[in-house]
Amino acid sequence: HYEKYSLKSLLGVISPGCEIVQVDGVTEGAACTTLLAKDLIDNDDPLLFANSDQFLDWDSNEFMYSMMADGIDAGMLTFEATHPKWSFAEIDESGYVTRVAEKDPISNIATAGIYFWRRGSDYVKYAEEMIEKNIRFNNEFYVCPVFNQAIEDGKKVKIFQFDGMWGIGTPEDLNYFLKNHE
């Protein structure tokens, strides 16, 4: 895809100076794939991950403003759903995430695949801990369960609820989106 779609020049127009990390083959999951960029993200800069199999109708500025609030270490964009194809978050009475689950509806708060970390180094630390503990789902290391490591360490994780989530990762989801989205 890198050469076929001229990704270097395309991404350079969208985000001048961006770094591109190419993947040679299949990894053991998205968390492993993200860590291929460890030398670029293991720092004190904010980090934002976005899955690529959804269409979102949202205000990214509102999300980032909410995530940058004092005392917040990490967060996620969420929507209401219960289908077990999503990741899910459970929150306490203060609105902080108490745990997340992959493909297990522990609540009706599903994650939209947009994940924020105030410091990239926190993500790297907790992703490596999760991998070291061999915490897998469907034999893969997913990104969302990394939050559980942070929560166990006392980090404050919050949600940002919205209504504009459209999954497009399967042919059925894409067809539904094309027929129903205006």
Residue ranges and their predicted role:
Residues H1-P46:
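Conserved N-terminal catalytic core of the sugar/cofactor nucleotidyltransferase
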Residues Y5-S9, D57-N134:
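Conserved core of the sugar-phosphate nucleotidyltransferase
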Residues V21-V23, L77, F160-F162:
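Conserved beta-strand termini and adjacent loop/short-helix elements that scaffold enzyme active sites
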Residues L35-L36, E62-F63, V146, Y176:
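Alpha-helical elements of Rossmann-like donor-binding domains used by nucleotide-donor carbohydrate transfer enzymes
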Residues D44, G71-I72, K155:
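Short, high-confidence coil segments that cap the C-terminus of an alpha-helix
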Residues D44-F55:
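Short beta-strand-to-loop acidic/aromatic patch adjacent to the donor-nucleotide binding site
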Residues D53, E80, T170:
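Active-site glycine-centered loops adjacent to acidic/histidine catalytic or metal-binding residues
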Residues Y96-W166, E172-N175, K179-E182:
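Catalytic-core segments of class I nucleotidyltransferases/pyrophosphorylases
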